[in-house]
Every structure is written in structure tokens, then in C-alpha cells.
Amino acid sequence: HCTSSAASDVYKRQLLSLDTGNALRTQAVPETAASIELTNMFAGLSGELKGENYPPNIPNTIHYTTRDPIGVVCAIVPWNAPLFLTVAKIAPAIVAGNSVVLKTAEQAPFCALLLSEIFQQELPPGVLNVISGLGEECGEPLVTHEKVRKVTFTGSFSVGKIIAKKAAPKLCPVTLELGGKNPNIIMSDADLDIAIQGVIDGMRYTRQGQACTAGSRVYIQEKIYDKVINGVVEKLSKLKMGNALDEGSDIGAIISEEQLKRTLHYMDIAKQTSSAKVLHGG
């Protein structure tokens, strides 16, 4: 109920697009819907978390499990899907009987703060706590705090390594979902219409490529190379880049000026490589 209410409010205010720069139609609306579905799934699982007895295989023994909340969970979310990933971290933790301290991304804090505001109306005090701020100032004290018994982080590989090291002395469980270099692979027997659309979808062009699951390169069997490349360029040329709040826009904005400069820097590096060609845009 809380997530549905928050999602409705997010949609009305167009907050997800304002928070991230992601296009309303292609990203913000689907993310909002997925957040509701995910919460409903965890709510449905809440009644399944209980102790069970098992037939013993050793005489004169009893085998059983108990529902045992871990305690305080530190959850750190990135800026590229702030509503969905906030829900993905707090919902299972709360369902399992834990309290959560969530640190938002400094670039996109508003969806998480709104979600927290609505959740506070239903949850007991202290169950869900949300802070915003820089990683070194807010994230590190949370990760190293003695009362935090579980850490979950979604973000960059470099920051993930730091978090793992900081949490290691406590021997508390750490869950890391980190970015990577994910290739798309297209073989000559593929259905090219599906494969080409798969490149567009898989590389997350409608999220400006800003996703840890985004394909960062494509391996194409030589005999179909030209067909695939031409097909991808043709589909890309039909995507509309524009104001994220415009329902007609397929592609919104890069999250920040810093990230934009970084993207342009990598494009410049590619252009200086003799074997590289810019086929569209750039």
C-alpha cells in the first residue's frame, strides 16, 4: 500500500524524471510500475518466513529453523534507478523483521525521501531511516558502525571494493551489486530483428546507457557484422532525445555535468583510436 501510494505521488509529480533525467515514458513510468510489483512480491512472501522442523538423520536430535532478523541493515543506492533499487533493498529487509538505514545517492535523493515519508505513516518509529549526503561523510560511518549487521550496496566496482574492506573487520554480511563490462554476443544464426533490438534494449540507450546491467560492447560474427551495425544505427536514428518530461522523448539527460564530461572524454579517446569510427551522433 505504501509503495503504491508513493509511486502514485512520484508519477503525479514526475519526480523520478526530475530526480534522474530519465525519460518519463520509456524509463520513469516502467520503473514506477516495477517498484510496485516488487513490493507486492515481497509482501506476499512475508507469511512464508517462519521456522520449520526437519526429519532428523541423527538419532535423538531435533532439526529446525527459526525466523531470526539480522538487525540493522545499511542500504546504499545509486542514482540511476533510485525508486526501484530503494524498494529492492528496504522491502525484503523489513519483511524479514529488520530495520533499515538507507543512504540515497547525492545526485538523486528525492524519490527515496518521498518513499520514506509515506512509509513513516505505517511503520513503527525507527524501522526505516533515510539520510542523504556524500559517500565519505554518510556512507562510510554507516558501513563501519558497530550496530549495522548487514550492508547492501549497488554502485561502482571501485566503491564496492572499499565498502567490502571497510565492513570486513565486523565480519558482517555484505551484498554488492556492481557495474561491469557486459558484452552482447550475436551469432550468424540469430534472428537479426530480435538481436538488433536486443542491442538497443541491452545497452540501455533509453537510460542514456546508465545502468550496471547495460551492455558495453557487442561481439558480432563477421558474416553478419554489416547488417547488425546498419540495423542498430537505423534504430538509433529513430530514437528521440529530448526533455525527460516530454512524453515523446525516448532518451532523457545524463545525470550530471560531471558524468557528461566523463562520457564525452571516453568518446574523445575512442575518436583518437585509428580503428574506431563514430557511426551515429558524437
Regions found by a protein language model. Give the residues of each.
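Single conserved hydrophobic/aromatic residue that forms the stacking wall/gate
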Residues: 1-7, 11
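Short loop-beta-helix segment that forms the pyridoxal 5′-phosphate
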Residues: 22-31, 130-132
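Phosphate-binding beta-alpha-beta segment of Rossmann-like dinucleotide-binding domains, i.e.
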Residues: 26, 30, 40-59
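Hydrophobic packing residues in well-ordered alpha-helices of helical domains and bundles
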Residues: 28, 32-35, 112, 263
